[in-house]
Amino acid sequence: MIQIEALPAFSDNYIWLLQDTAKRRCAVVDPGDAGPVERWLAANPEWVLSDILVTHHHNDHVGGVERLRQLTGARVCGPANERIPGRDLALDEGDRVDVLGVTFQVMAVPGHTLGHIAFFSDQPATPILFSGDTLFAAGCGRMFEGTPEQMQPALARLAALPEQTQVYCAHEYTLSNLRFAKAVEPTNPHVQQRFEDVTRLRAENRISLPSTIGLERLTNPFLRTAETLVKQKADEWKGHSNNSHVAVFAALRSWKDTF
């Protein structure tokens, strides 16, 4: 059985720690800083770090990779089309990778970066998704390299995963994302309830993750481009009609960039 724990890093990053409690083996996702992982391993000396999964090349996701690889000999698995330090296994759309006895499907999800990948598995009792900086709780990543024509379909693919899928994204952006979601859909009761719930969690310094695909479908404006009110708000922002899901998404993303 795999357990998943968040190791906070920097101001708002989460390094996800996967633990095989039976074999005392673990893996991490997007270790932008080696420190939190080193401290956990030092406190749990009987555990072995076997794998490092990377979603994209930004330094706050790969900054600790080489040191951890040198310290532990862990296998580094990352996107084939990006420069990932110490990468041992290059992964692209349709590939599969076994980690701690769990098989993950690799999904190409370009937009935030061109080579960005996500890791999905439906083998655990509850499916799990490591979405990096593509899909956030109630939001999505900025398009630093890709285009709306790439990112909107990528998000739609993630939204089509089973609704019970637990979403482990890489940043604690949920509250600010929900403020934007409220501006887009001020009458959406699910958004309002989630905003209240997350406000309480963060006031207690508690993590707001994981999310679920089902909850994202109800509250994430970037997955709700087919909703009439969402389109109307996007049209108001742009000053003209947006006649495709991609156009609505692009309008929302440009609005969020300045929100």
From Swiss-Prot:
GO terms, biological process: methylglyoxal catabolic process to D-lactate via S-lactoyl-glutathione
Cofactor: how and how many bound: Binds 2 Zn(2+) ions per subunit.
Molecular-function GO terms, alphabetical: hydroxyacylglutathione hydrolase activity; metal ion binding
Annotated binding of Zn(2+) 1, by residue: 56, 58, 112, 133
The protein's enzyme class: hydrolase
Binding, Zn(2+) 2: 60-61, 133, 171
InterPro entries named among the record's database cross-references: Clx_II_MBL, Glyoxalase_II_hydrolase, HAGH_C, Hydroxyacylglutathione_Hdrlase, Metallo-B-lactamas, RibonucZ/Hydroxyglut_hydro
Acyltransferase found in the keyword field: no
SUPFAM superfamilies named in the record: Metallo-hydrolase/oxidoreductase
Domain of life: Bacteria
EC number: 3.1.2.6
Family the entry assigns: Belongs to the metallo-beta-lactamase superfamily. Glyoxalase II family.
Known role: Thiolesterase that catalyzes the hydrolysis of S-D-lactoyl-glutathione to form glutathione and D-lactic acid.
Name of the protein this chain belongs to: Hydroxyacylglutathione hydrolase
Gene name as annotated: gloB
